[in-house]
Each structure stands twice: as structure tokens, then as C-alpha cells.
Amino acid sequence: MAEDIEEIRRKKLLELQKKLAEQKRAEEEQIRQEMELEAQLQAIMKQILTSEARERLTRVKLVRPELARQVELILVQLYQAGQITERITDEKLKRILAQIDARTRKEFRIKW
């Protein structure tokens, strides 16, 4: 009887360890894929943005990461569609940021 209980515990422990190992592998794979995508994104940004524009986007990413990510994704889509024919300067990036910010900004009004 005690041996049966011990056997059940051992099987349960092995099962839990196996599940934990699978979860860990899945998480590591997801992290690796995210890092690959980020590296590809940065490589494309290097190709289509001037150094000043990249610096600006990096600063925007510190303050408004969701806005910076949205701009990056839009720029990648345009690049992949062949709609970006020349490097984007800091001035062009400012205009793009302003346009996207205007579309996504939520307006708050305080009534007295």
C-alpha cells in the first residue's frame, strides 16, 4: 500500500517535471522568436531611417513605446510593399509621428 502511494507520487512528480520542462522550452522558443523579429525590425529600420531619425525613434520609444512600435510596424509594411523609395529623414519622421499621434491620441476633457 505504501509502495503504491510512493509510486503514484513519483509518477505525479515526473509528470509535473515534464510539463514544467515543456513550458520552459516553449517560453524560450517564444523569446528567441521575439528576439529574431526585433533584430529583423531593427535591420529594416537601419535601412530606411537616417541616423537622426533612428535616434528620434529611440527617444520616442522611451517615452511612448506603443507609439514607436506602431510607427515601426507601419514603416515596415510600407517598406515591404515597396512604397518607401528613399531614406526617411528626421523631418519626415516627425511628420509621421505627428500624424499617427493625432489619429491615436485620446482627448481628455475635464468639466467643472
Curated annotation (Swiss-Prot):
GO cellular component, one term: cytosol
Annotated keywords: DNA-binding
Superkingdom of origin organism: Archaea
Cited Gene3D superfamilies: PDCD5-like (1.10.8.140)
GO molecular function terms attached to this record: DNA binding
Family: Belongs to the PDCD5 family.
Name under which the protein is recorded: DNA-binding protein TSIB_0525
